[in-house]
């Protein structure tokens, strides 16, 4: 199944049923008076977060979703039947945005969470409501109200506690295979991973967190190179970043410069994102002679001016992986507990994530508009530099993001 993380849909809530004008007709009851019932209420449209879907691909092919119209009223003061509400299933981590106002209607981050996105119309009134002392036989009834019509954008961001970042072939997919049951494709060429992969890292009884393997970034990604920022937005909901650096690249490149590329791209794309807590992981230590390893790792850390936490691993053999798992679990648990115990800290965390998501959304849309303008100019014959931005409408990837237990 294709991984689709954006879709624009049109939703129409159900129209309300019409009220009717009718009169009581019963033997031995002359001038029975009005008995027209009201119309039913039109169905609302909701989105509901489900864990059995991980892509918005269905909304690429079915872009219009209408709730049913309610029934008209009936005689004998019987109201018409309201129409059923329409529920649109979306993956956990979906944000709903009104395309006309750019208002964020809500985020769905829990299984079963629902969000009202279009309200059904109220039913019309039957002629019973218009009876008065001067008008005992009203023939007036009102029509039902129309349901809301909206054009919305669904944006999917994977929900993970930890985001794996690094250049292509840094060992991210191998790492997530080591720590979870996720099985992303692994190969010795760049861009093996084309879509985010999620894995649940199980530490023990009731202790686990979710890790996301984000497709590799390259220099210029914030301006559209390679996979561009197409999937960088998926780290917007992570608590911290795990930055993997290949200390012995097969192409002979400098690991220090490779690490700086990622740090610079994060800063260019979103300063708020670059300020997330980061852990540096020096990977593939099994590829360096033991007598040279300590000197090389010390050199990399010093050249980067890194003052944060550093781990050394060999993801292929699993060396050093457990230490990272337990460190991450302890940090995440402390943060979760503090959010529960300290309302001020919880509010600050929420505000930070809201700022981050707003910044990511703004930057993503700005780059998409620049890409569209460049493509339009190219069609008109303007000489433009090559633009490799991967527009979401042209996504042909064939992999689905899957939660692995």
UniProtKB/Swiss-Prot annotation:
Its EC number is 3.6.5.-. Pfam families: GTP1_OBG, MMR_HSR1. It comes from the Bacteria. Residues 383-399 have a biased composition (Acidic residues). Residues 371-405 are annotated as: Disordered. InterPro entries: G_OBG, GTP-bd, GTP-bd_Obg/CgtA, GTP1-OBG_CS, GTP1_OBG_dom, GTP1_OBG_dom_sf, OBG_GTPase, P-loop_NTPase. Mg(2+) binds at residues 173, 193. GO terms for biological process: ribosome biogenesis. Residues 371-382 have a biased composition (Basic and acidic residues). It is found in: Cytoplasm. GO terms for cellular component: cytoplasm. GTP binds at residues 166-173, 191-195, 213-216, 283-286, 314-316. Its cofactor is Mg(2+). Residues 1-159 form the Obg domain. The keyword Cytoplasm applies. Residues 160-333 form the OBG-type G domain. The keyword Ligase does not apply. PROSITE patterns: G_OBG, GTP1_OBG, OBG. Belongs to the TRAFAC class OBG-HflX-like GTPase superfamily. OBG GTPase family. An essential GTPase which binds GTP, GDP and possibly (p)ppGpp with moderate affinity, with high nucleotide exchange rates and a fairly low GTP hydrolysis rate. Plays a role in control of the cell cycle, stress response, ribosome biogenesis and in those bacteria that undergo differentiation, in morphogenesis control. Monomer. This is GTPase Obg. The gene is obg.
């Amino acid at each position: 199944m294709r991984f689709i993380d954006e879709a624009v849909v049109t939703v129409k809530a159900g129209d309300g049923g019409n009220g009717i004008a009718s009169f009581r007709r019963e033997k031995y009851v002359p001038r029975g008076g009005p008995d027209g019932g009201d119309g039913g209420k039109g169905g609302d449209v909701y989105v509901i977060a489900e864990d059995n879907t991980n892509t918005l691909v269905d909304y690429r092919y079915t872009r219009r979703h209408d709730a049913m119209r309610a029934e008209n009223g009936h005689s004998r003061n019987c109201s018409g039947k309201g129409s059923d509400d329409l529920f649109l299933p979306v993956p956990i981590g979906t944000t709903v945005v009104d395309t006309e106002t750019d208002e964020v209607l809500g985020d769905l981050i829990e299984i079963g969470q629902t969000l009202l996105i279009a309200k059904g119309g109220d039913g019309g009134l039957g002629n019973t409501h218009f009876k008065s002392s001067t008008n005992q036989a009203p023939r007036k009834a009102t029509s039902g109200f129309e349901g809301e019509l909206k054009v919305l954008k669904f944006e999917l961001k994977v929900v993970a506690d930890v985001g794996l970042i690094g250049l292509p072939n840094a060992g991210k997919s191998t790492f997530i295979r080591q720590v979870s049951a996720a099985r992303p494709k692994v190969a010795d060429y760049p861009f093996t991973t084309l879509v985010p992969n999620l894995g649940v890292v199980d530490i023990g009884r009731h202790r686990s967190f979710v890790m996301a393997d984000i497709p590799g970034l390259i220099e210029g990604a914030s301006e559209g190179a390679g996979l561009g920022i197409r999937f960088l937005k998926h780290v917007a909901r992570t608590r911290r970043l795990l930055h993997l650096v290949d200390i012995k690249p097969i192409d002979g490149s400098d690991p220090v410069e490779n690490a700086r590329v990622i740090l610079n791209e994060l800063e260019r794309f979103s300063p708020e994102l670059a300020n997330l807590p980061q852990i540096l992981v020096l990977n593939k230590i099994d590829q360096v002679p033991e007598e040279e390893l300590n000197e090389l790792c010390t050199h990399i850390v010093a050249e980067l001016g890194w003052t944060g936490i550093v781990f050394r691993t060999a993801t292929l053999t699993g060396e050093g992986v457990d230490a990272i798992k337990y460190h991450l679990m302890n940090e995440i648990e402390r943060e979760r507990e503090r959010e529960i115990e300290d309302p001020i800290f919880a509010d600050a965390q929420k505000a930070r994530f809201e700022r981050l998501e707003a910044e990511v959304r703004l930057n993503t849309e700005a780059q998409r508009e620049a890409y569209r303008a460049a493509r339009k100019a190219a069609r008109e014959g303007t000489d433009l530099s090559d633009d490799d931005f991967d527009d979401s409408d042209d996504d042909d990837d064939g992999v689905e993001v899957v939660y692995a237990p």
